[in-house]
């Protein structure tokens, strides 16, 4: 297991606490002129897997000073019923932001529900409008995991303008947004995927390698330039020979740390910062709702 005292390890929990402290201070200042609403977490049907994420989000919200409400809708709820409930939350001025927990039941079209969340309450950055805005360098309400990956790059102290970055993985919610976020900051980004002829050819020249594929230990030390930063977004459940389930990233951390200048552990790396980005998006949402005049009635 990675030793977080190693200077090469970027401790996501420490980054999270630093971010949340700053967010709390800014929210307290914002609340002096306009009341800050609550975050509403929506789960469709019970799920032990979701409960872990909800607890982490609730804990971070408490640290940031944000009211947090968890609601669980029936697993049998129809698509239209869910959209009506989301519309009601959109219209409720006491609701700052809406979080749609995943996975959802098979009969629910998750993208349709994400599209139903008003962009100014889309604290996850998952509404198509929010993702599309990134193309125009409006990066303040970005998908949380993508924003967290960029924040981890910042934690290295490497200047983003001109930085050579290789993004391995091109999903709609991580890989592609990461590429656009970094390009908005002036980085030179190469995106690799399953049809890339030689991922290693690209990764070995990169100052930063970011990985989000979902394949345990895909990246070894032979694929990394000495001194490069390695940001591991992958989360994989692997059963070892003793029958014990372990959480592994897409990077062989123990081997790669001997080559890398910086590396994120799994767990405890990008994950905690993703939750902090959710709270930062909530702060941004509040400011934009104030600017749009949504909160004037609540202020009065």
From Swiss-Prot:
Q: Any idea of its EC number? A: 1.5.1.5, 3.5.4.9
Which pathway, per its entry? One-carbon metabolism; tetrahydrofolate interconversion
UniProt GO BP? L-histidine biosynthetic process; methionine biosynthetic process; purine nucleotide biosynthetic process; tetrahydrofolate interconversion
Q: What does the entry list as the binding residues for NADP(+)?
A: 169-171, 235
Q: Could you cite one Gene Ontology molecular function of this protein? A: methenyltetrahydrofolate cyclohydrolase activity
Q: How does it assemble?
A: Homodimer.
- Role: Catalyzes the oxidation of 5,10-methylenetetrahydrofolate to 5,10-methenyltetrahydrofolate and then the hydrolysis of 5,10-methenyltetrahydrofolate to 10-formyltetrahydrofolate.
Put simply, this protein is called Bifunctional protein FolD
State the species of origin.
Answer: Rhodobacter capsulatus (strain ATCC BAA-309 / NBRC 16581 / SB1003)
Q: Lineage of this protein's species?
A: Bacteria, Pseudomonadati, Pseudomonadota, Alphaproteobacteria, Rhodobacterales
Gene that produces this protein: folD
């Amino acid at each position: 297991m990675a030793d977080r005292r190693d200077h090469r390890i970027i401790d996501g929990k420490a980054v999270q606490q630093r971010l949340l402290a700053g967010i709390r201070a800014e929210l307290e200042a914002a609340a002096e002129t306009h009341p800050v609403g609550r975050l509403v977490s929506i789960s469709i049907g019970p799920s032990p897997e979701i409960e872990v994420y909800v607890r982490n989000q609730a804990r971070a919200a408490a640290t940031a000073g944000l009211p947090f409400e968890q609601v669980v809708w029936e697993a049998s709820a129809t698509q239209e019923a869910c959209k009506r409930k989301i519309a009601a939350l959109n219209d409720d001025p006491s609701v700052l932001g809406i979080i749609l927990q995943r996975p959802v039941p098979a009969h629910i079209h998750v993208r349709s529900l994400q599209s139903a969340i008003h962009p100014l309450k889309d604290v996850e950055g998952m509404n198509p409008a929010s993702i599309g805005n990134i193309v125009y360098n409006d990066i303040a309400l970005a998908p949380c995991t993508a924003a967290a990956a960029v924040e981890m790059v910042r934690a290295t102290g490497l200047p983003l303008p001109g930085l050579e970055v290789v993004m391995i993985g091109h999903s709609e919610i991580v890989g592609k947004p990461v590429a656009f976020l970094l390009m908005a900051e002036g980085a030179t980004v190469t995106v690799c995927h399953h049809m890339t002829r030689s991922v290693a050819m690209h990764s070995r020249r990169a100052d930063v390698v970011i990985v989000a594929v979902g394949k345990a230990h895909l990246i070894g030390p032979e694929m990394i330039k000495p001194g490069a930063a390695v940001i591991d977004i992958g989360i994989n459940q692997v059963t070892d020979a003793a029958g014990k389930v372990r959480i592994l990233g897409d990077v062989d951390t123990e081997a790669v740390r001997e080559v890398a200048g910086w590396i994120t552990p799994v767990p405890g790396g990008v994950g905690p910062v993703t939750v902090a980005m959710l709270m930062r998006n909530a702060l941004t949402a509040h400011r934009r709702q104030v600017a749009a005049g949504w909160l004037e009635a609540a202020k009065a």
